Amino acid sequence: MTGDVPDRIKVLWFLPTHGDSRYLGTAEGGRSVDLPYLTQVAKAADTLGYYGVLLPTGRSCEDSWVIASALVPLTERLRFLVAVRPGLQSPTLAARMTATLDRISNGRLLINVVTGGDPLENKGDGIFLSHAERYEVTQEFLRIYKRVLSGETVEHQGKHLHIEDGRLLFPPVQTPYPPLYFGGSSDAGSTVAAQEIDKYLTWGEPPADVERKLDAVRELAEKAGRKLSFGIRLHVIARETTEEAWAAADRLISRLDDATIASAQKVFARMDSVGQARMSALHGGDRAKLEIAPNLWAGVGLVRGGAGTALVGDPDTIAERIDEYRRLGIDTFILSGYPHLEEAYRFGELVLPKLPTDHPVKATGSSVNTGPFGETIAGDHRPKSLASAS
């Protein structure tokens, strides 16, 4: 039932507000993630031509709204995908925050709707709702939130939320409101997406599994008289050769011991997120079962919650794998790599120019303007690129 195939795609990067490292599961190779570092990553993404950046949310992260507000004036075109949290925020407060950040960024805000899938973290935030109730709250929240941002005055008495004279005095730049992104693999999540959301997100499962998931959501949306677009969240390990890429993947988990893997998998098992369960099932915590589809590697998910798979390979191979997902109807790719500053450049230089993006990316020049101390050949002339020499 694959729907429309997009001709062009959007490619976003990721701001690691929860930490960054050269290795997973160890403090070795870790680096301080502070505002100067996040500024470097954001400016790199802006310069290289990524469409935007995703900011994660939760108690393991710096607050996404505060960080995005700090980085907006330091960037020019970059969009910021920031989370609203039904159950943690009132819909009218979230609408005011959304409108303000959209205005001060001149329309560079994207909204990620996050229901939350860790019962212990939810309790720490004062949320004692079941899985089904959280999605009920999410749907009520979104119906109020969208109406308020659209300029309506809202009176609402629902099962979970009660709003009187809910309205917005200062509207957002984007009309009727910034695009809404959402990921949810349960039946309840798929229903909310089909009825309320602009772009449905999936984590990086094998293409056949992704196709089935998107078809199910697409069918629900059609029944609701709506049409969605689709995005996917993946890590990437791109190198000039396939051999180098797989060596880099092995190196990323080379400091990871079995006890750390077991501890992480125990945490994931307590969650009631269907998406997290699907991620964990791809590898079962077993190092020997990490290539789950051609060039799709589940090593990140041994210890990282959420997105746990990476595309691994040379530039042409990764571009081909991305095109496989595009042909399933996906038009938005939210990517990351460890460490995020270096990998933003590596992917941005090796792969991004090969992709059919609908936003401008940094052009590969015919020569390199560097400096007088060795980069320029013999201090006499500039090296030409391989493309211009061919």
From Swiss-Prot:
UniProt enzyme class: oxidoreductase
Alphabetical list of InterPro entries matching this protein: Alkanesulphonate_mOase_FMN-dep, Luciferase-like_dom, Luciferase-like_sf, SsuD_RutA_monooxygenase
Keyword Protein biosynthesis: no
Keyword annotations from UniProtKB, A to Z: Flavoprotein, FMN, Monooxygenase, Oxidoreductase
Cross-referenced SUPFAM superfamilies: Bacterial luciferase-like
UniProt key word ATP-binding: no
Residue ranges of the region described as Disordered: 364-390
Family matches, as CDD domains: Alkanesulfonate_monoxygenase (cd01094)
EC numbers for this chain: 1.14.14.5
Catalytic activity: an alkanesulfonate + FMNH2 + O2 = an aldehyde + FMN + sulfite + H2O + 2 H(+)
GO biological process: alkanesulfonate catabolic process
Alphabetized GO MF terms: alkanesulfonate monooxygenase activity
Entries under NCBIfam families matching the protein: alk_sulf_monoox, PRK00719.1
Physiological role: Catalyzes the desulfonation of aliphatic sulfonates.
Family: Belongs to the SsuD family.
Protein name (record): Alkanesulfonate monooxygenase 1
Originating species: Mesorhizobium japonicum (strain LMG 29417 / CECT 9101 / MAFF 303099) (Mesorhizobium loti (strain MAFF 303099))
